[in-house]
């Protein structure tokens, strides 16, 4: 029998209690976003520490709220998220607690363009998505059907297409994540310097091409390639041509092809087909520049590894049971199978990696 008073058993029991109660973390984060806590603290003035009672009047409370909210319960949420590095706690005297934003908390502050990571948090915790999580085990038992489909009767992207609210939140969430990521890679990656014509496969409204062309004026023409119904709604962008089509059939020709967050939701065989079509569209020496999450070879307890593996389970649960985050070795194999002899990774962002495949 184990000695239950030993240090190792005490730590084990504590760890499993934390894991069992882990749902408190995303749900409290979701609550913080719904209430607008980050904006309330930031707009209070230079991120000055505020107490729960001082934050409360600044929150997004429903108009029918009669008591003005509960500062004690707000403080409970603030304390819990402080333990995860979202807020900093400042003790005033022996009783009062005040809170400011950490760098993590600042990602939830709405910027001048109306964007932040807040929409990403909300998008991940919509009611339809939450219904899928109790069914994660079915991805092992019945991998042919996604837990999301089992819970909602149809695929996530099908529902996004039918619901303006879900689609709008999805687009805002992706923009909130994409813009800072694109700024980071455009500052740290020079692979677009020699490109004359660039295709963005799955480029949606063309926002990434807009940013690339602004940073690299040598790119004479950008081709935003996506489904016909998607590019039909895309705005006019100087230097960008919107082209509708199917990446599983063919891809427009160019010096280089850019692809962001596309491969992770497709199976290995589907990825091979997409990448083969990209290979066929490139000249010798041309590049496929893909931006995807890359799993580490070995599993550890770092924030990066956990974030990537959590994202992998999200893909499995919500989008495709056999879509997945991949290791560098798996991407090399996909590239070789599509004909690309040369592969180079660029680890500029901690979550998304630039993967350069050269023909």
Swiss-Prot record:
One of its GO terms (biological process) is nicotinate metabolic process. Its main location: cytoplasm. It is found in: Cytoplasm, Cytosol. PROSITE patterns: SAM_OMT_II (PS51683). GO terms for molecular function: methyltransferase activity; nicotinate N-methyltransferase activity; O-methyltransferase activity; protein dimerization activity. It catalyses: nicotinate + S-adenosyl-L-methionine = N-methylnicotinate + S-adenosyl-L-homocysteine. Its EC number is 2.1.1.7. S-adenosyl-L-methionine binds at residue 226. Highly expressed in anthers, pistils, developing siliques, and developing seeds. Changing residue 264 to H: Loss of catalytic activity. GO terms for cellular component: cytosol. It comes from the Eukaryota. Keywords: Cytoplasm, Methyltransferase, S-adenosyl-L-methionine, Transferase. Pfam families: Dimerisation, Methyltransf_2. Involved in nicotinate detoxification in planta. Catalyzes the conversion of nicotinate to N-methylnicotinate, which is a detoxified form of endogenous nicotinate in planta. Belongs to the class I-like SAM-binding methyltransferase superfamily. Cation-independent O-methyltransferase family. PANTHER family: O-METHYLTRANSFERASE. This is Nicotinate N-methyltransferase 1. It comes from Arabidopsis thaliana (Mouse-ear cress). The gene is NANMT1.
